[in-house]
Amino acid sequence: MGILNKIFGTYSERELRRVNPIVNKIEALDEKMQSLKDEDFKLKTEEFKSRLEKGEKLDDILPEAFALVREAANRTIGLKHYREQLIGGVVLHQGRIGEMKTGEGKTLVATLPAYVNALTGKGVHIVTVNDYLAKRDRDLMAPVYEFLGLKVGVILHNLNNEERQEAYGSDITYGTNSEFGFDYLRDNMVVYKEERVQRKLNFSIVDEVDSILIDEARTPLIISGQGEKSTEFYKVADYFTKSLIAEKDFTIDEKANSAMLTDEGVNKAENFFKVDNYADAENMEIQHHVVQALKANYVMKKDKDYMIKDGEILIVDEFTGRAMEGRRYSDGLHQAIEAKEGVRVERESKTLATITYQNYFRMYNKLSGMTGTAQTEENEFREIYGLDVIVIPTHEPIARIDNADVVYKSEKGKFKAIVDEIVERYKKGQPMLVGTVSIEKSEMLSSMLKKKGVPHQVLNAKYHEKEAEIISHAGEYGMVTIATNMAGRGTDIKLTKEAEEAGGLMIIGTERHESRRIDNQLRGRSGRQGDPGESRFFVSLEDDLMRIFGSERIQGIVDKLGLAEDEAIESKMVSSAIESAQKKVEGNNFDIRKTLLQYDDVINKQREIIYKQRSEVLEGEDLKDQIRDMIRDVVYTAVNSHISGVEEEFETELQNLVNYLEDICLPKALVKVKDISNLSDEEIKEKLLEAVENIYIHKEKEIGEEQIREIERVILLRVVDTKWMDHIDDMDHLKQGIGLRAYRQQDPVQAYQFEGSEMFEEMIYNIKVDTVRYLFHVEVEKAPEREKVAKETSTNYDEDSVKKQPIKKENRIGRNDMCPCGSGKKYKNCCGRMA
């Protein structure tokens, strides 16, 4: 591969050779654009729109349109896209990922493809990681778009429905990944079509694309409503778990991020909860609470995974170190942490709607992204999103010096060396950005520096409000900034003249992250636009990466060398061991994301069907034909499922059939068994259908045509929403227990696909049954009002969607259990069809 790259160039270099002629055309139009009057720019926009309407393609007008934006930016905000930024713009327009280093002006680059694609009138979404960046970028670039005659909006967390509709109605809309995703879900929960805010998803430019499409890919967006379960059991499980002894009663698997009881722990659980067999299916509720309490107490770390603020548990984003206000762990883990920390335990929520970022962003007609670091994940971008990564050349050569890692035996020795390094460089006034992996480590380092008399700023989840301000000063002379991981990402660190002379920004990594990309992001904060700078990572054998995934050989070598805890080794072997540990973890995480996507694709296809059907109900003026189809399906399916063809049982089956339909849509005694006992199955269907349709026609006359159409819409929306919410729960429970199928030599993914499909078919049938039942039993006193079946109480990120424990709903009959009615059939083939 290396030899081929030398001969033909890398993939990016080959692709850039195709882009260069387009960029040459853009640059050649520079003089022409400079000669335009200010009022001509809006006229050019109208001209482009007209050309597109007449059949020209976006690529036909691209060189001229890009040249126009370039001149507009120069006149309005004093910034003119340089060649490399034009290349980046073309790459984004082509629906690819442009890898652009920090400080290369990604915000300005986005104006080029955003303008061109907005000319179609279908809207463009520019996605950032937080509200601050969305508003900042919109405010910075709005003058450019407005000068060109385009409208630009921004979606922020606190906007109401009307403001959101206005922002989405703009030509270009800035916003965060979570706001775009949640608005999509909310749009599919509205009861009037006028309440929807988003248009059809057209073109998206995702800033920090690796953070959103890879780091957060396992994070479903969840809109929750209030659950009914009591919270008392969380406290009981917490009390039990705190009485256990590590290793003896339970073990922790750090790689899987989980904890489980040993045989001795199981015995203790049986005694404590007074049950005979802890593993019994009827004790799943106990198992679930114990597993979550174990995880809360022994796996989840305060000030690393979560923090406490004003008596509330806040999730800390592991990638940015930011506190995620208003987000809760799902599946009872948040409640278990609340019980552990002795704060008020909130009720477990019910999922009303959910989607992952993977599936949300794959719905756009065209998707593109920008980031400083994407190449290490190129395979994943290509395989999951169909996006290739093109490395955009930097405007100035990178002058940053990346030093080799230094490795210490103990964490204590490592931090002593870090402090010594900081003190040494502080003396000469060199600014430093020190990256840590947790709030706890930030604060430990901070107290060590205080003892040495080194003034510094701490940037972590606890001080999120000051984030951008602190980061903007990090390049000043003598400034020391400690930051959790990627806090402050998206804000440039600009050097002062004195800081430049002192050596530029020094990056100190206090630990290697499990992803090389996150390390590269930290490094990339220094050396922007050809600035001087330096970086070095300090590693100890006690760090999580080395301890969990590192090689025992390294530990052996260090032991043989007899190193003191503050002695360092710099060795190629150690560096390559670190890299191979990172590759191992990256591969493992990619596999997890791929597997999760296979599971999520099942419910994603189902979601698309339900949301499409729901949309048709909202949009359609007349549901009469749809309702008549439902009536026919209910009657025909009832006949098919009740009549087995066994002569001796025929009379009984007919009576059961009549009873069943009387419960749904037949008035009592309208059809008697003797009326249909001499008919064939097909004749029975026609006779029953005729009777039911006559009642429907009578009801329509009685209520009035206009009003019954609205009643049908109200009923169908309520039934679809209720059944879909229950189905989400059912699919989640199926997924939680599906891993055990591997013990039966079954492929869990295939089993999930098959059973999930069966459950979906059942749900669709039950939607028809309930819709017909409610419609035939409706009594009208006043015009029906549409209302949501459940009230949204919160939005959520589920940080731990892997290896959840099954929860048992009280007194729930399994689909494959024998039906309690005594028919001798399985529940799913008997009363389960009617449930």
Curated annotation (Swiss-Prot):
Required cofactor(s): Zn(2+)
Main location: membrane
Topology within the bilayer: Peripheral membrane protein
Positions bound to Zn(2+): 819, 821, 830-831
Keywords recorded for this protein, A-Z: ATP-binding, Cell membrane, Cytoplasm, Membrane, Metal-binding, Nucleotide-binding, Protein transport, Translocase, Translocation, Transport, Zinc
Catalytic activity: ATP + H2O + cellular proteinSide 1 = ADP + phosphate + cellular proteinSide 2
Organism: Clostridium botulinum (strain Langeland / NCTC 10281 / Type F)
Quaternary structure, from the entry: Monomer and homodimer. Part of the essential Sec protein translocation apparatus which comprises SecA, SecYEG and auxiliary proteins SecDF. Other proteins may also be involved.
Subcellular location field: Cell membrane; Cytoplasm
SUPFAM superfamilies cross-referenced by the UniProt entry: Helical scaffold and wing domains of SecA, P-loop containing nucleoside triphosphate hydrolases, Pre-protein crosslinking domain of SecA
Function comment: Part of the Sec protein translocase complex. Interacts with the SecYEG preprotein conducting channel. Has a central role in coupling the hydrolysis of ATP to the transfer of proteins into and across the cell membrane, serving as an ATP-driven molecular motor driving the stepwise translocation of polypeptide chains across the membrane.
Protein family (similarity comment): Belongs to the SecA family.
Gene Ontology MF terms in the entry: ATP binding; metal ion binding; protein-exporting ATPase activity
Source organism phylogeny: Bacteria, Bacillati, Bacillota, Clostridia, Eubacteriales
E.C. numbers: 7.4.2.8
EC main group: translocase
Coiled-coil intervals, chain numbering: none
Record Pfam families: P-loop_SecA, SEC-C, SecA_DEAD, SecA_PP_bind, SecA_SW
Cellular-component GO terms for this entry: cell envelope Sec protein transport complex; cytosol; plasma membrane
SMART domains in UniProt: SecA_DEAD, SecA_PP_bind
Protein's recorded name: Protein translocase subunit SecA
Residue numbers binding ATP: 85, 103-107, 492
Record note on cofactor: May bind 1 zinc ion per subunit.
